[in-house]
Amino acid sequence: MRRTLLSLALCGALMSSSAATVEAAPRPPDGQVFSYGAHARQNITVYGPRSAHRPALVILHGGSWARDTDWSGRARWFAARGFTVYDTDYRLTSDAAWPAQRDDVLAALRWVRHREGGERPLVLGSSAGGHLAVQAGTYGAGRSRARAVVALSPVASPYRAWADGGAPGASTERRSLRGAAERLAGCSPDLGGLRCWARWDDLAAASHASGAKDSPLLLIHSVGDFVAPAHSAELASAQRRAGLTDVSTRTVRGAAHGGPLLNTPNTERTTLAWLRAHS
């Protein structure tokens, strides 16, 4: 009987200890919404307190430049790990023509930097948001506005996406992205003249590669990603030729695209460590 009572007491103590551990876990912070412009989509949801000890991280969602996608869960996840997270929306192709999307991201980065007392933020973008993230890190003097950039499945070359989507046997996702890229450019390479080609060239992050003036880059795809790893390989090669040494590419197993890449083995840990190292 005594042994039974001791066992019950021990189980109760373990359950109490486990409950205390759960209660002590950090609570994901709620977000506060701010506007960085007059348009309804020009807003930022901030997670986590502002502090000199918390690096700022700007998140740019994907959605083929045509729709919003929800990154609030990951924003809270990063905030719980010591970042002040700025989950940023921007005008879509239904709202305004290119380069409005890039203009919005640059305006948002200026707003964040002002709020952070002049400190440059880190940037994390996914898919179409990855395209805007690498644009932010390469357009002009990217390093002056973004401390470093992580891009998950970045559509670094919308023209490549357009060409891949028109190839025989192209997947549904690639065909859809082809149409989205053409809507972003506002013209078809098949029919457009010099102005059209200039816009497609401007859309390619590699066209803006300037080496040491640009932000460090971590570019991640999966082997079966419908946004092929060649997007990032081309950008990385252009940056290395221009003199940027801090550029890394990763290709992981599977067919994950964008945000779900963070759920693949080691990618979450690699991304978090890289961001912290560049804070």
Task: Please give the residue ranges for each predicted region.
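Active-site glycine-rich loops that stabilize anionic/oxyanionic intermediates
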Residues: 54, 61-66
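The serine-hydrolase catalytic nucleophile loop
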Residues: 66-76, 90, 231
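Hydrolase active-site cap/lid region
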Residues: 138-194
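Short beta-strand/loop motif that positions the catalytic acidic residue
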Residues: 212, 219-221
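Alpha/beta-hydrolase active-site loop
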Residues: 96-115
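N-terminal cap/lid segment of alpha/beta-hydrolase-fold proteins
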Residues: 25-51
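C-terminal catalytic histidine-bearing segment of alpha/beta-hydrolase fold enzymes
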Residues: 220, 227-229, 233-279
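Conserved alpha/beta-hydrolase
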Residues: 77-95
